[in-house]
């Protein structure tokens, strides 16, 4: 039996905060792997600004050097909204001997009461919550918490900085920054 942490998100772009969360949860919970699952269309956000191909390429570059980090693009292959329930149902059907843990930030802990089919989802997985500045970890739902170093970082902040040609060194993996530059993503590198 393998124990797998799931880290979902738009990863637009994937940054060091994502990698920090994944590694800290993997170590604290002694998980075998962390699977990065980029969403197609998240139900709680507007569409992503970057294509699925670019996002998967950037994730792969970000996680390449870590043997316990894997990319799973199952949600990108699905049409429409990406609901966690559908993803976990598919994963448990495909990998019945695995135990799955779904990693969420404080922003999503607060949002749990509004999740699609939350009661059924709670029977299928264990949620692992990590702190995120500005959000509470208080919930009536069963969530295991992992204390991680917190940094005020989001993909939204990084996209804005890239568009404004502001300094982002040490916030993105170098390989992802090179990819952004080469493909002129987020307005970076355009005149």
UniProtKB/Swiss-Prot annotation:
The keyword Zinc-finger does not apply. One of its GO terms (biological process) is NAD biosynthetic process. Pfam families: CTP_transf_like (PF01467). One of its GO terms (molecular function) is nicotinate-nucleotide adenylyltransferase activity. Pathway: Cofactor biosynthesis; NAD(+) biosynthesis; deamido-NAD(+) from nicotinate D-ribonucleotide: step 1/1. Its EC number is 2.7.7.18. InterPro entries: Cyt_trans-like, NadD/NMNAT, Rossmann-like_a/b/a_fold. Keywords: ATP-binding, NAD, Nucleotide-binding, Nucleotidyltransferase, Pyridine nucleotide biosynthesis, Transferase. It is an enzyme of class 2 (transferase). The keyword Nucleotide-binding applies. It catalyses: nicotinate beta-D-ribonucleotide + ATP + H(+) = deamido-NAD(+) + diphosphate. PANTHER family: NICOTINATE-NUCLEOTIDE ADENYLYLTRANSFERASE-RELATED, PHOSPHOPANTETHEINE ADENYLYLTRANSFERASE. Catalyzes the reversible adenylation of nicotinate mononucleotide (NaMN) to nicotinic acid adenine dinucleotide (NaAD). Belongs to the NadD family. This is Probable nicotinate-nucleotide adenylyltransferase. It comes from Oceanobacillus iheyensis (strain DSM 14371 / CIP 107618 / JCM 11309 / KCTC 3954 / HTE831).
